[in-house]
Amino acid sequence: MVVVGLDVGYGDTKVIGVDGKRIIFPSRWAVTETESWGIGGKIPVLSTDGGQTKFIYGKYASGNNIRVPQGDGRLASKEAFPLIAAALWESGIHNDGSPVDLVIGSGTPLGTFDLEVKAAKEALENKVLTVTGPEGEVRQFNITRLIMRPQGVGAALYLLNQGIIEQQPGYGVVIDVGSRTTDVLTINLMDMEPVVELSFSLQIGVGDAISALSRKIAKETGFVVPFDLAQEALSHPVMFRQKQVGGPEVSGPILEDLANRIIENIRLNLRGEVDRVTSLIPVGGGSNLIGDRFEEIAPGTLVKIKPEDLQFANALGYRDAAERSM
């Protein structure tokens, strides 16, 4: 029995595979009819219907026909299915074409949790997913169980197991800064149960900063910059149209504004319960950029996570939850 942790986000898909192997790729895919080549050689082309419909995914999928998941953790969505197939393909599970029994740990935001879990189990549990690779090789994944946890709980469980946070009186607030949204999950640190009335989703994410930077670069160069290039330009300068654009000096004010909006909304939603917060836990890719600012919400409570774990915290927790369920 193989166990994987899977976090299908609107921005990126994260996987914890065999022997703890970590994989991350942009959550986008596109149908293709021909073989493609890049600088590094042949671009991976997969199929889930015996080769009739082929698709490319991740950084290789670009252009007007790309498809993305409908939201974080929407595993039952037809737009997420190729991403699940790609994640399992890259997870390090190899076989001779016969089905490999698999348990998937995953999650979805608390607000739609029950609905999404029911749909995901109906779509995936006790199903055999057959994936055909670029050389015609076939791998079959028999999904025997799907273990779901609310987004943010996975990260908290992982940190608890690592000894980074402790069970104690008070609240832990997991702030997951994603592409479209910032999901805030408040957990009672004594029993690790979500506090529903203090958990919420903000329609603010790193995508807002990327769009703002993209507009700024377009004004400077006269050309519309691709989304993935603008995303890269948030953290360091990049070359675009033979000109160096972006970088911290340009993106700094934009990220400051993003952090201010998130902090203001979190304070508003937590209302008079801020004094009970003992751990602020930023996770997600956006936390690499603005996570340190969140200490302003409750000074002295910020939990520092290794930068390499920030994006994978939920997936690590999902995998741990799946292992514990066996």
Swiss-Prot record:
The entry's keywords: ATP-binding, Nucleotide-binding
A Gene Ontology molecular function term of the record: ATP binding
Temperature dependence, free-text field: Optimum temperature is 50-56 degrees Celsius for the polymerization reaction.
Annotated Gene3D superfamilies: 3.30.420.40
CDD domains for this protein: ASKHA_NBD_ParM_Ta0583-like (cd24027)
Activity profile over pH: Optimum pH is 4.5-5.5 for the polymerization reaction.
Binding site for ATP: Y10, G11, D12, T13, K14, S179, Q231, G285, G286, S287, N288, Q311
SUPFAM superfamilies named in the record: Actin-like ATPase domain
Pfam families from the UniProt entry: ALP_N, MreB-like_C
Family: Belongs to the thermophilic archaeal actin family.
Task of the protein: Polymerizes into bundles of filaments, forming a helix with a filament width of 5.5 nm and an axial repeating unit of 5.5 nm. Polymerization of Ta0583 requires NTP and is optimal with ATP, but GTP, UTP, CTP, and even the deoxy form of NTP can also support the polymerization reaction. Nucleoside diphosphate or AMP-PNP does not support polymerization.
Leftover remarks: Mg(2+) is required for polymerization. 4 mM MgCl(2) is sufficient to enhance the polymerization; however, higher concentrations of MgCl(2) suppresses polymerization. Polymerization is also suppressed by addition of NaCl, KCl or CaCl(2), with half suppression by about 100 mM, 10 mM and 18 mM, respectively.
Name the record gives this protein: Archaeal actin homolog
Originating organism: Thermoplasma acidophilum (strain ATCC 25905 / DSM 1728 / JCM 9062 / NBRC 15155 / AMRC-C165)
